[in-house]
Amino acid sequence: MAVVGVSSVSRLLGRSRPQLGRPMSSGAHGEEGSARMWKTLTFFVALPGVAVSMLNVYLKSHHGEHERPEFIAYPHLRIRTKPFPWGDGNHTLFHNPHVNPLPTGYEDE
């Protein structure tokens, strides 16, 4: 009796659920076109993008030096209420003396 009940329930569940093929896949494009698409994107989008980025880095490296701006001691910038826990306490962690001023001005002036 229990076997009959299980088989009838499984038949009912099987009929109520239609068998759909992959609903999220694009049926018009097959898997054979997918490899061709990615190969095309690699050669015509990714590699030229890398080449343009390399050219940009090369041109920026030969651009030359920039003049740094004049130091103006604004009261709301570079506030030190307590020292940094490294070094002398006045330099930030990634301090660059040519670019980053201290509260009193640039170091190499």
UniProtKB/Swiss-Prot annotation:
InterPro entries the record matches: Cyt_c_oxidase_su6a, Cyt_c_oxidase_su6a_CS, Cyt_c_oxidase_su6a_sf
Family stated for the protein in its record: Belongs to the cytochrome c oxidase subunit 6A family.
Disease: Charcot-Marie-Tooth disease, recessive intermediate D: A form of Charcot-Marie-Tooth disease, a disorder of the peripheral nervous system, characterized by progressive weakness and atrophy, initially of the peroneal muscles and later of the distal muscles of the arms. Recessive intermediate forms of Charcot-Marie-Tooth disease are characterized by clinical and pathologic features intermediate between demyelinating and axonal peripheral neuropathies, and motor median nerve conduction velocities ranging from 25 to 45 m/sec.
Regions crossing the membrane: 35-59
GO molecular function, one term: oxidoreductase activity
Quaternary structure and interacting proteins, as annotated: Component of the cytochrome c oxidase (complex IV, CIV), a multisubunit enzyme composed of 14 subunits. The complex is composed of a catalytic core of 3 subunits MT-CO1, MT-CO2 and MT-CO3, encoded in the mitochondrial DNA, and 11 supernumerary subunits COX4I1 (or COX4I2), COX5A, COX5B, COX6A1 (or COX6A2), COX6B1 (or COX6B2), COX6C, COX7A2 (or COX7A1), COX7B, COX7C, COX8A and NDUFA4, which are encoded in the nuclear genome.
UniProt KW Ribosomal protein keyword: no
Subcellular compartments: Mitochondrion inner membrane
Pathway: Energy metabolism; oxidative phosphorylation
A Pfam entry, by short name: COX6A
Gene: COX6A1
Topology Mitochondrial matrix: residue spans: 25-34
Residue numbers on the Mitochondrial intermembrane membrane side: 60-109
GO cellular component term, pick one: respiratory chain complex IV
Membrane topology designation: Single-pass membrane protein
Protein's organism: Homo sapiens
Primary location: mitochondrion
Protein known as: Cytochrome c oxidase subunit 6A1, mitochondrial
Transit peptide, start-end: 1-24
This protein's UniProt keywords: Charcot-Marie-Tooth disease, Membrane, Mitochondrion, Mitochondrion inner membrane, Neurodegeneration, Neuropathy, Oxidoreductase, Transit peptide, Transmembrane, Transmembrane helix
Record GO biological process: cellular respiration; generation of precursor metabolites and energy; mitochondrial electron transport, cytochrome c to oxygen
Described purpose of this protein according to its UniProt entry: Component of the cytochrome c oxidase, the last enzyme in the mitochondrial electron transport chain which drives oxidative phosphorylation. The respiratory chain contains 3 multisubunit complexes succinate dehydrogenase (complex II, CII), ubiquinol-cytochrome c oxidoreductase (cytochrome b-c1 complex, complex III, CIII) and cytochrome c oxidase (complex IV, CIV), that cooperate to transfer electrons derived from NADH and succinate to molecular oxygen, creating an electrochemical gradient over the inner membrane that drives transmembrane transport and the ATP synthase.
